[in-house]
Amino acid sequence: MILVTGGCGFIGSHITDALIEKKYKVLVMDNLSSGSMENLNSKAQFVKGDITNTEDIEAVFKKYPIDAVCHHAAQISVAVSMENPVFDINTNIIGIINLLQACEKYKVKRFVFASSAAIYGNPVYLPIDENHPKNPLSFYGLSKLASEQCIRIFAQDTDMTYAILRYANVYGPRQRAEGEGGVVAVFMNRMVANKECYIHGDGKQTRDFIYVKDIAAANVKALECHVSFTANVSTNVYTDIVTLFNVMKKETGYEKQAVYTQPRKGDIKDSYLKNTGIHELLSWYPEYDLSKGLKETAEYFLHA
């Protein structure tokens, strides 16, 4: 049985769907603070629980025969991490330590973790590979980096293997506007409501946008692999915000022009991640280009 923490959330629910499609038994644990039961696959088992509560975790591991954990329960907002770093660190670092202790006690074989490009900070060179310097600019990035190291420390003394997946900017159906790839959800919500869309600065800043179903496929492959590794999960393609806006206009039928505002303080100018590592190790490669991914995303938001 595979435990997906945060399985009622944006990314976790898509991973749950992909695992169930491959006939895996899936248990979802979620505290529903940001996730929704509407996202839960009906074939998954569900336990309401919080990773910061050791009693909740102990109850789950004691009752269910968990072979692998796919950890996606997290505080996902960079802004929240800066406003309330203690909350961020408690959820993201204490939470993962609680989980890892249970994995050690109950002899879990595999641990897959959702990390982030936020651990790298401002790019020193592009594309960013896994050896790029780590200089997070937020407590969110810091908590992801610390979580990675927690996994490696626990894995030293156990038979558990791990996959640490550093995501680029993930977008797709079920996304809320708060997360890292949130610009797509922000634009989608505003376009569907026919409200103004705001672009900070000149819109020439670039990001690596990856569709959530490609992320889910990478997680399935990572769970099925038995080697410990750390890898970027990305498209290796950069897209500027103006181009993103124009593709989204086309897919939603939105007719307004973008409103340009002041650049946001601390925003990274350009970012995209090299993905040859995961491609070579797992034969994974993204199947969705931006146009195809945004088309599916627009269909979801238009009918939500």
Predicted regions, residues:
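N-terminal Rossmann-like NAD(P)+-binding domain of SDR-like oxidoreductases, especially those catalyzing
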Residues: 1-170, 288
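Residues in well-ordered alpha-helical elements
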Residues: 55, 67, 79, 86, ...
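C-terminal substrate-binding subdomain of Rossmann-fold SDR/epimerase-dehydratase oxidoreductases
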Residues: 192-304
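Hydrophobic alpha-helix immediately C-terminal to the catalytic Tyr-X-X-X-Lys motif of short-chain
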Residues: 146, 150, 154, 187, ...
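Residue-level signal for the nucleotide or nucleotide-sugar donor/cofactor binding architecture
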Residues: 52, 83, 91-94, 131, ...
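Short beta-strand->alpha-helix junction loop in the catalytic core
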Residues: 172-173, 265
